[in-house]
Structure formats: C-alpha cells, structure tokens
Amino acid sequence: MAFKNFKLETDADGIALITWDIPGRSMNVLDETSAIELETIVKETTADAAIKGVVITSAKEAFCAGADLSMLEGMNRSYAEVLKGKGEEAANQMLFDNSRRFSQIYRAMETSGKPWVAAINGLALGGGFELTLACHHRVAAENPKTRLGLPEIKVGLFPGAGGTQRVPRIVQPQDAMNLLLKGEALTLDKAKALKLVDAIVPAADLIKAAKDWIKAGGKAVAPWDEKGFKLPGGPVFSKNGMMMFPAGNAIYRRETYDNYPAARAIMSCVYEGLQLPIDAALRVESRYFAHILRSKEAAAMIRSLFLSMQELNKGARRPVDVPPSKLKKIAVIGAGFMGASVGYVSARGGLEVVLIDRDQESADKGKAHAQSVVDGLVKKGRAKPGEAEAIMGRITATADYAALKDCDLVIEAVFEDRKVKAETYAKAQQHLKDGAIFASNTSTLPITSLAEEFKDQGRFIGIHFFSPVEKMMLVEIIMGKATGDVALATALDYVRTIGKTPIVVNDSRGFFANRCVMRYIAEGNEMFLEGVPPAMIENAAKMAGMPVGPLSLSDEVALDLGLKIMKATEHDLGPNAINQDHKKLMVELVEKQGRFGRKNAKGFYDYPEKGKGQKSLWPDLAKLQPKHLDPDTLDVEELKQRFLVVQAVEAARTVEDHVITDVREADVGSILGFGFAPFTGGTLSYIDFMGTKKFVELCHKFTEKYGSRFAPPKLLEEMAAKGETFYGRFPPKKAAA
C-alpha cells in the first residue's frame, strides 16, 4: 500500500524501515493524514509474520516538530458543534476519543510484539518525541544542534500521547517534572544521561545501528510491561514520593500562581498515573488532556503563541506585490549596548554588518560587546568556535559614514534626542545608495516627525527592538505617515532573516508596546502612592501573570530614563500629558536620592554585587509613600485585575486609534514584548475570553473608583453593546503564500 506521508520498505532480514516525509513541509508534524497512515502501518507490520522488527526515521533534517496545533484547534471547533447539536456528554466523548488517537497508536506499537526502534535523525519535539518514547529502543544521530523535548506547556497544553506516563517511568521524578513542567528541550547528551535516548551514533551509521539492535535480539517489551517493574523514584507513597509530590505542588504554585491549568494537570497525571498500570494511566492522561484542550487558556495560547505567531513569522503583514529584498549588508549607526546588540543578531542571521559610531574607539567597544556574547555561547557549548569566528568576521566597526555606500538597510540606534538623530540623518544621507532603506530604533519619538529630517520619507521606517536584543523575540515595525510598501517589506524581510517575530504598527507616541507597558508601570506607581505596600504591589503583579513586578521593571528600564521621557512628553504636549504625582516621585528617587535603577545598583530595589545575594526592596521606600494602607484590608484579586485591565484597555485604545490594525499583533506583541500574562493569550484575547460586556463593566467600576485611565474607548463600548469580540469584528487575514 502506498502512503502519502510515509515510505515503508522491508529488507532481506525482515526489518521494516518507515521513512517519514510529509510532502510540501519543511518538518514532519502529527496531522490527520499521519495519524491515519501510521495507524495502518502499525496494523500491517504487526500482522505481517515476515516482519521481524520496525525502524522509524525521517527523510527531513528533523525527526518531528510535534502535533499540528491547527488540528487540535479543529478538535475544539468540532467539540463546539457536537455540543450544540448533541449535548455535553456526546461532545466530551468525541473530544476524548479524538484527542487520544496518537496515544492509542503509540500503545499499539509498544504492544505489537515486535521490536520498534526510533532512529532519531534530528529535532524531536512534543508528540514526535512521545512517539520515540513508545519505541523499545532509541538511537540518535550525532548532532550538537539536535534537541528533544516536550514543549506543550508553552502553548497551554501538556504531553497527551503518553509523555506524562512514560517519562516518569524512565527518569527520576524530579527530572521528569522539570522536563514536563518547563517544556525545555534537551541536548542529546543530556537525553542520553537521563536514559531518554539509548545510543548516539554517527549520522551515517544511524539506520544500521537501529537495525543491528533488532538483529541482536532487542526486546519487544517496554520495561513497564514486564513483571516486577519498579519506578525509578520508587512508589508514589514511598519516602521519596512523599518528598517529591508535596514539594512539587508548592514549587508549581510558586512558579505559576495556579494560572496554568495544564501545569496542574501534569502534576495530577503523574501523581495518579504512577499508581496505576500503564494502560489505565494512559486513560487518565487522556481524560486530563481532553479537559485541558477545551480550556480557555489552551485555546488562547494556541491561537496567539502558535497559530498567530506562525502567521506573522511567515509574512502575514508583508505587501504581496513587493519582491523579496535579498538583503546582504546592513549598517547600524550607534554602537552602544542596543546598537551593538542589533549588530550582533544581524551578523548571527548571516548578514554583513557595518557598526558605526562617532569615533573608532566607540565603534570598537560595540564590536567588543558582540565578541563577549559569542564568547559566552562558545563557553556554554551553544556555539562552535568556528561559528563564533564567522559571526564576528561579518561585523566591521568604523567611524567612517562612507561605509554606508553599499548597505541595503541602515538602522539608527543613537541617543533618544531629536537633535542628535537629525545630525545623524544628515551625515548618513550623504552616503546612502539609491533605494537603501533607513530605519530608526527609537522607542519613544514618533517616526513621522523623525522622517521630516529625511529626503525620501517613503524609505524611512521604525524598527524598534526590545532589550536585551539577543533574547527578546519581538520587533516592532513602525509605519510613518509617508512610509512606503518597499520599506515595510524590507523591514519584515530583515526581521525574518534575524529570526525574530514582527508586528507592524502605525505611528503614535509610544507606538504599541510602550503605550501598554507604561500603563503597567504607572499603575504600580499609582498603587505605591495610594499606600499599597511595595512587596504587595510586586507580588500581586506576578500573581496576575506578569513576569516581573512594575517596580522591578521600572528599575530595569532605568528610573532616570523614565523621568527623562516624562519631561520630554511634558515639553511636547503640556503638563496635563503626564501624571505630576508620578513625576514628583521620580524626581525624588532620581534627582534627590540618586537612585537610577539597576544601572547604578539602586532604584526601588537595592542590588548587591554579583554573586553576593539577591536584590531586595529599598528599606526606605515606605518613607516616600504619602500614606500606608493596611495590607489585610486590600483586595488582592482587585490589585491583580487592575494590572491586567489597565494594559488591556490601552491595547483596545490602540485599535480604536488605528495604531494596531491586526488583532494578532496586539496579542503576540503584548506577550513577546512585555510579558503580558501569557495564559490569557494577550491583551485583546484577555478581553475576548472575559467577554467585552463583562470587561467594560469592570472598566466602569475601576473608572469610578480609581480614575479615567480605566475608561473604555467608544469602540469597546460599542462592541460590548453588540456582544462582539475583537477576533469576530476584526478577523485576521491569513499569511501571504
């Protein structure tokens, strides 16, 4: 029988070789066709007496990237249809049966009575890695870039094809929990040390090694199916188990504040499953998986962190009639920390980079920063010396603007000062080649006004990076009023080249990300001035799902920079454009107390020298508060809601103001740009899943109690009255082919 996604061959020794190769895809995924065909293959190889064993591998560079999450999203749509037509019991049964399909196929492999070997030739994640765990032997091809793991938790799910049951039956409970709850990918060496891989061999010997294991009489029985099998960490109710699970629950609560149902389900699956035979344990896993699959958190995270992000990365916002840019060489003007980092990630992406500053010494310092980054990667084993040398070889440091003459794209990353930027543009324009695109990395100054200093405003655009550039995945592309399609296409092509996720926004003060995150920081200041204890402010924010508290974030941004932005805004727009009480607080901290934030080791927090303890809130902070509220009288849930609502309502305003024109970008941008509670799916999904009517009611309540910053825009009032959602009213367009 011919298959679409697999090739099945049997050699003279009776060993079947299954080669996975989905046509038209760069990676194999577990989709509907793969399920049907793999199920058929398992049945055929099991029934064929001539087949002595089975090897499964991939024809692509990677083994399998995991489940096709759009298939899982489709299961939820089917659930809603069956729920409407046949009721809850029928819908639940349908979802349970469909969602455990791969789990059942893998169990059929495992109990086929014939030895199965996974010949892992590259990346194996999620359901792809679970497939290998159901094989009786796992052999991997040597490759320092290969990663194995179960990242489902990152999109609000958990491994539902046996991962929560097989992993803790192979490795120690603590290691199993780390793998399942963190979703981090393992190197081959780490996987082998944990016994998740049995052997690592040269790539040329991979299939031979897999077949040799079968020929040598490899067992066709999983360890947990053998009589007398003992769990690596002992029974759940043993001394070790009792040390593990109560502590694990405490750690889970500390890390997630119970915002992620999938994490709780993992704990339950492992705890309950390890007390049962494997078949019953797999049914337990499947029941929890079906429950989590229909949770709003999973729906929101799958949509934003997988589907939307994938569409944006593929060029959903790219003008279709502009040919590919074919970037080869770029320049970064300003070799400070930000500019040097932009230069590094560009060189890492394979581009030639000219790093320019006011003098050679400053330019060399920028290149030295890039050198320190690659040296760190080599030291950690995350890059080979040859790769590091190649990256550094692509960076040229200079003070000579004439080096711009053959650059396709120039990114300005100089000081946030209009005069300095204008001088830079005047120098640069003398040397730009025809058709070169010019971008500013400004984080605060409107692009349209900056473009006035540029001759051809159609070639001027904003490319806003987030710090630290090496780690932050988001890039905000800002369209000035005159920015043309070629500039936009070039910027998007550039962001794709350096492996980051773009969002495209229209020009306004603060653009999108800073508009929202400044509301978060300001709400922290507001609570501080209300008399909420500083520790309570920080903890409530983290409980709401934010990665760091607003006071800590202020320190990271730099208090003196925050004050400078306030003063610039006041100068441009007048005294009513800023909160004067907040300015007074910043003046006290920065100008009177000399506290600039992490940069000088003192801000809202005190920062000890490296290696000498953790940061702690400045003991004298309370003296700067005009009053002090009793923490026992404060509603923590309301504090949490204030942090999320104030950011979400600002995001809604950016839609009304046409700063955001694609709802996906608000959600993806808010999570990647400033860590807005990922379990919500982002700022607009937070509103949609709460319901616009309920959200507007909450806004009115907070407006009456705390002020106009919570007032919903007219657009949101209108949507609430009609029962609309953002994704319903503004359905996103699909990515360009």
Regions found by a protein language model. Give the residues of each.
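Amphipathic alpha-helical interaction surfaces in cytosolic regulatory modules
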Residues: T33, A47, K60-R77, Y106
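Structural motif
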Residues: I15-T19, E37, V55-T57, V117-A119, ...
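Conserved CoA-thioester-binding segment of acyl-CoA-metabolizing enzymes
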Residues: M1-T57
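N-terminal glycine-rich phosphate-binding loop for ADP-containing cofactors
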Residues: K4, D11, D21, L72-Y79, ...
